[in-house]
Amino acid sequence: MTQANLSETLFKPRFKHPETSTLVRRFNHGAQPPVQSALDGKTIPHWYRMINRLMWIWRGIDPREILDVQARIVMSDAERTDDDLYDTVIGYRGGNWIYEWATQAMVWQQKACAEDDPQLSGRHWLHAATLYNIAAYPHLKGDDLAEQAQALSNRAYEEAAQRLPGTMRQMEFTVPGGAPITGFLHMPKGDGPFPTVLMCGGLDAMQTDYYSLYERYFAPRGIAMLTIDMPSVGFSSKWKLTQDSSLLHQHVLKALPNVPWVDHTRVAAFGFRFGANVAVRLAYLESPRLKAVACLGPVVHTLLSDFKCQQQVPEMYLDVLASRLGMHDASDEALRVELNRYSLKVQGLLGRRCPTPMLSGYWKNDPFSPEEDSRLITSSSADGKLLEIPFNPVYRNFDKGLQEITDWIEKRLC
């Protein structure tokens, strides 16, 4: 089946699909203070989703393209779940968030199919994959249309990988007690086995969202990157997120000696946001298998255990947490009790001495990850490094922070 036909098959014009903002039925605790964060974007009045411009631009989307799609959503007069929220248009039609971003992705998909130059075609496929992922954002469980967009993103990503520099291999990993999971191993030019970074992504992202990290930071230094989806989304959708948050990544780590392209004696883990929860658990539980662990904006304790901090977090992010935990209709109180169990301090890990070198980067006044969480990580390590990233200029400092983190990882791997 061609990519175009797959799009037509998946996205048949139906209006009975559940609208994203209705999928998690928690008690809404009213108006929220505005939130701005480098890694998560910011709350904008009249939008359910956080608008994550920095990360979308970093992944290769033109700012004007973002505004164009937003404008189409705003201008729609179709029925909405909440008339006050632009991105709650019901059904797969004009104005619906998933429809508009997927339509934009199809434009790039068609460009990719028409392009004769393999490199340029690969770029267009990658662009389409990123747009399909934005269509599926924030990847809530049970969002049928979003899951279809994710399927198209994965297909586009595979097409891109065949044309872009280096080599990408799709790999299947067995996990006892459940379904196998699929990961992508990105390898630079040259002969392996390669030192490798195991990517632990955020809860509101897909594993295919991190190609820029590999291409700009790891590949130029001869470092491979292995990604898997977080539990409950994408290729890991059959696994629920549990307090043993690192379960899937642990099984991948244990399988690396059998992967000929990976130097299993030179492996690091890198965690974004809740992915840092996974990475730090690995630092404690699998220290012989890891040379280093780096974190960025870690969610390891405060957000999971502090009610005041949770009150500052946008509804969408709490919906993401509830969705990953399988608590779609739980009260806020039940969600708070469950989240507390995911704190690595409550679990008795953080605060204990850890032999694995750990770096943690943070932004001051980050509503999701206060400085204290990063200090807790680095002070627990026998070789810890704390990295403050200034907020403005946000894009330049984000890039500089990633370069410093890559330098630190490289010294411990190469």
From Swiss-Prot:
Task: Cite the Pfam families for this sequence.
Answer: FrsA-like
Annotated catalysed reactions: a carboxylic ester + H2O = an alcohol + a carboxylate + H(+)
Q: Which InterPro entries match?
A: AB_hydrolase_fold, FrsA, FrsA-like, FrsA_esterase
Keywords in alphabetical order:
Hydrolase, Serine esterase
* Listed EC numbers: 3.1.1.1
Effect of inactivating the gene: Deletion of the gene increases cell respiration rate on several sugars including glucose.
* GO MF assignments: carboxylesterase activity; hydrolase activity
Q: Does the keyword Hydrolase apply?
A: yes
GO BP of this protein = regulation of carbohydrate catabolic process
Q: Further notes on this entry?
A: Increased expression results in an increased fermentation rate on sugars with the concomitant accumulation of mixed-acid fermentation products.
Q: Which PANTHER family match?
A: DIENELACTONE HYDROLASE DOMAIN-CONTAINING PROTEIN-RELATED, ESTERASE FRSA
Q: Which family does it belong to?
A: Belongs to the FrsA family.
Question: Subunit details for this protein?
Answer: Forms a 1:1 complex specifically with the unphosphorylated form of the EIIA component of the glucose-specific PTS system (IIAGlc).
Q: What is the documented function of this protein? A: Catalyzes the hydrolysis of esters. Displays esterase activity toward pNP-butyrate. May stimulate mixed-acid fermentation by acting as a fermentation/respiration switch that down-regulates respiration and up-regulates fermentation rates.
- Could you tell me what this protein is called? Esterase FrsA
Q: Which organism is it from?
A: Escherichia coli (strain K12)
